[in-house]
Amino acid sequence: MYLLTDEVARELKKPFGKVYKELPSIDGKVVSIGDVTTKHLLSNGIIPNLSILDFKTKRNIPVNIPHKFKTIFEVENPQGCISDEAIERIKYLSTIHDRDMALIIKGEEDLLTIPVIKYFPEDTSVIYGQPDEGMVLLKITDELKQKIEKLLKDMEER
């Protein structure tokens, strides 16, 4: 399990990619992280390979996503950490070439962008919400994977 440190929290406040109000066209494998982002993609006809959700926004405001996902997995991931269970499930899901999968989080999904970038293949599009700004779209690259490895080293490991 990895615990968020103040140093990493400061780093994560900065978007990892370009922030969009409306996304450009997206091709290839897509992972969405967050309820509002996923709802936006689905309402625009974009079905991610994997959607990571906790059915809340801003920690406690409920979000209704009227979509029936093809495959659903659940894991626990407490606030401010990346659980071993979440890491193992994301690692497994990164090997599946299916669409319309959901990973439902009991707890909080905010930090799960980190293991998604670590385990999903290069050129995967990752989309997550940047509170009160829009959505961040990034493509996984080797350089981004190296940045994530550094962040993980700066987190407290238990």
From Swiss-Prot:
GO terms for biological process: coenzyme A biosynthetic process. It catalyses: 3'-dephospho-CoA + GTP = GDP + CoA + H(+). GTP binds at residues 35-36, 54, 56, 109, 132. Pathway: Cofactor biosynthesis; coenzyme A biosynthesis. Pfam families: DUF359 (PF04019). One of its GO terms (molecular function) is GTP binding. It is an enzyme of class 2 (transferase). It comes from the Archaea. Keywords: Coenzyme A biosynthesis, GTP-binding, Kinase, Nucleotide-binding, Transferase. Its EC number is 2.7.1.237. PANTHER family: GTP-DEPENDENT DEPHOSPHO-COA KINASE, UPF0218 PROTEIN TK1697. Belongs to the GTP-dependent DPCK family. Catalyzes the GTP-dependent phosphorylation of the 3'-hydroxyl group of dephosphocoenzyme A to form coenzyme A (CoA). This is GTP-dependent dephospho-CoA kinase. It comes from Methanococcus maripaludis (strain C7 / ATCC BAA-1331).
